[in-house]
Amino acid sequence: PADVPSRAWLKFEQALAWRGWDQLDLRGQTALDLGCAPGGATYALIQRGMNVLGIDTGEMDPRVLDLAKAQGVRFDHWRTAAGRLNLTALPREVALLLCDINLAPPLVIPEIQRVQDAVQARRLILTIKLNTPALEDRAHEFIDTIRDFAPAPVFATQLAGNRREICVCAG
């Protein structure tokens, strides 16, 4: 839709539908969104009634804050890099961990694992960027690495909204 802050909204909604998670009642549960700015996926989470902790050094679209107020859900934006997170300050009950950070998999996957080890989210939706042929050739390696720390089962595909990236869903 034209009124959403970014393309991440579409990628998140497609991931939910692909796994059949679009029918889940997520109201009142907590999501942790790594790489949240400008707020497309966060917007979708809030539309579904989730409380969201967003992690990103970037600015959030004001529509995200407005929607959170209108929906009566909590949205906190920590303006820090995922690698600088104080893990002990993260919520302990995380239903969904999202990550859509524009970094190469060898840089971002260890950060996802570090956060997942701390919060033990029940489900993960990850966008893994494969911006070069060399990274594309290693896609199976990256998925196997994610399988080592993510809740089972782990699935990966390229959704219609994905460009040079794959969607990995776990849990």
Specify the residue positions occupied by each region the protein language model found.
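Conserved proline-anchored active-site loop of SAM-dependent methyltransferases
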Residues: 34-38, 96-105
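S-adenosyl-L-methionine
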Residues: 1-27, 47, 51-96, 104-106
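Conserved class I S-adenosyl-L-methionine
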Residues: 26-37, 44
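Short acidic, S/G/P-rich loop/turn micro-motifs used as interaction or catalytic elements
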Residues: 41, 84, 103-105, 131-133
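C-terminal substrate-binding/active-site "lid" region of AdoMet-derived donor-dependent transferases
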Residues: 109-171
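Active-site proximal loops enriched in glycine and acidic residues that flank catalytic Cys/His/Asp
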Residues: 56, 79, 101, 128-130, ...
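Conserved acidic residues
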Residues: 29, 95, 122
